[in-house]
Regions:
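A conserved alpha-helical element in kinase catalytic cores
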Residues: 135-156
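Bacterial Sec-dependent N-terminal signal peptides
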Residues: 19-47
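Middle-to-C-terminal accessory/interaction subdomains
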Residues: 101, 105, 232-296, 300-448
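Hydrophobic alpha-helical membrane-insertion signals
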Residues: 40-98
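Conserved oxyanion/phosphate-binding beta-strand-loop segments in alpha/beta enzyme cores
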Residues: 72-133
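Bacterial N-terminal signal peptides that target proteins for export
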Residues: 2-13
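Short, solvent-exposed loop/turn and secondary-structure capping segments
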Residues: 65-67, 122-125, 142-143, 176-178, ...
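Internal "kinase-insert"/substrate-recognition segments embedded within catalytic cores
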Residues: 118-119, 133-134, 155-159, 171-284
């Protein structure tokens, strides 16, 4: 069933705009008035396929920063029954800003912490969620597509997400990506975390989640001894001294083996301390997307498990991947936005050593050729997402005066390479990039 939202102001103007941008839409369904109050600039008598999230902060307080939560109510309507039986979700919780560079952008991302666990739109049952704005990605599909690649590859956990339309304090903010927050839990990143008070050697041999990010702004952090990776404790966030030193020693031991003369030795080499399979999967996702945040510099997470090995548990942050950044030189002579050329292989610590291992290269070829037919279907996957978004896109990129969110499809946005002029052109670029990237990688991986 398709849902309708009604606006008494200038509905004909926006209906005409939606027709121009999205090749026409109309409806004869009955009008549904939004609750609990009429938004200032809701969509007028226009069909919606994706769910609608309505958030109201206490006393309509502004969300000013990433540190301070504000009490809020959250209502989610999936009237189109895309992910649920159509029963609305209604709950309370707290909301704050999130992100690094993305928080400085006009379209803000948010972190939500519900008062009670909830299974939102068919995803995991949890309290913590994020609303990704994807402001720099005018296709609004790069994170979604990368998560699909992660699912195909078989990462231990792929964050689930849903495209939604967001109303905040009666103002329509456009298309957002409701996504599972990065955390350790049975339904997300499933790790057996170290006990809070563990200090003995046997007890320290448990699981830890680390964040690798050049911002290096955590309370407990260190650089590794060889590659100088900036590692911060994610969970536990506040390790005791014994836990801190144990984790640091394990990473330095792994790097000593990886960068040592005997790194290929099956008994003392790097394979004793680094899980090759998980890094292989991670590599394929990051190389295929040509993600400038994927070269072990930021938005990367590593797990140290009880077996003493370092694992790649999941992937995150792809809004400027797939040729969407103009500030990275992938390699000498290669375009920063083009689909050709290695990136992770040549420009990432650790991986430049992995590729000196014939066993790693052989495993890569085998896995790539098994997965390639599924990768070839990615343009079709993207089109399916576009079909779901088609009515919402017109509202996201139309003016607030005509009922839209006011985000422009034109003009310069950091770090985009160019203004492609239309949403259709943005989608076409993404599809073409993936097709060409697959062709280049298929040829060059098999030639290794």
């Amino acid at each position: 069933m398709k849902s309708l939202h009604f606006n008494y102001i200038a509905w004909a103007c926006v209906a005409t705009l939606a027709c121009v941008v999205l090749s026409a839409c109309s409806s004869k369904d009955s009008v549904v008035l939004p609750e609990p109050s009429q938004p200032v600039n809701p969509t007028p008598e226009v069909e919606t396929i994706i769910p609608v999230v309505t958030i109201e902060t206490e006393k309509h307080a502004d969300i000013k920063d990433k540190e301070n939560y504000i009490n809020c109510s959250v209502v989610i309507n999936d009237d189109g029954k895309l992910y649920t039986d159509g029963t609305p979700f209604s709950g309370t919780g707290r909301i704050r800003g999130r992100g690094n560079s993305t928080w400085t952008m006009p379209k803000k991302p948010y972190k939500i912490k519900l008062d009670s666990k909830a299974k939102l739109l068919g995803m995991s049952t949890d309290k913590e969620w994020v609303l990704l704005a994807n402001y720099s990605d005018r296709s609004l599909l790069r994170n979604t597509t990368a998560f699909e690649i992660s699912r195909i590859v078989g990462m231990d956990w792929t964050p689930r997400s849903r495209n939604v339309e967001l109303y905040l304090n009666n103002t329509y903010l456009g298309v957002y990506q409701l996504t599972e927050h990065v955390k350790v839990s049975e339904e997300r990143c499933d790790l057996d975390l170290v006990d809070e008070d563990a200090t003995e050697d046997a007890d320290l041999q448990a699981d830890y989640l680390m964040e690798l990010d050049f911002h290096f702004d955590a309370s407990h952090q260190f650089h590794t001894s060889y590659a100088s990776l900036p590692l911060m404790f994610k969970e536990p966030e506040q390790p005791n001294d014994a836990q801190f030193e144990y984790v640091k020693s394990c990473f330095n031991r792994a790097e000593a083996a990886l960068y040592g003369d005997s790194f290929l030795d099956p008994e003392v080499g790097y394979s004793q301390y680094i899980d090759i399979e998980s890094f292989l999967k991670y590599y394929i996702v990051q190389e295929l997307t040509k993600n400038c945040d994927g070269n072990m510099r930021g938005s990367c997470y590593l797990a140290l498990k009880s077996d003493g090995k370092v694992y790649q548990p999941f992937v995150w942050d792809f809004d400027i991947a797939f040729g969407n950044a103009n500030h990275i030189t992938w390699e000498q002579g290669a375009s920063s936005t083009g689909p050709d050329g290695w990136y992770i292989k040549t420009c990432s610590p650790w991986f430049n050593r992995f590729f000196l291992d014939p066993a790693f290269v052989s495993a890569l070829k085998q896995k790539w050729n098994i997965l390639k037919p599924q990768f070839d279907k990615l343009p079709d996957f993207i089109q399916e997402q576009v079909n779901q978004l088609k009515f919402a896109i017109g509202r996201n990129f139309s003016s607030t005066g005509s009922g839209g969110a006011g985000w422009s499809i034109h003009g310069e946005i950091w770090p985009n390479y160019e203004d492609r002029g239309s949403y259709e052109a943005e989608v076409k670029f993404l599809k073409n990039f993936i097709t060409a990237r697959l062709q280049w990688l298929d040829e060059h991986i098999n030639a290794l």
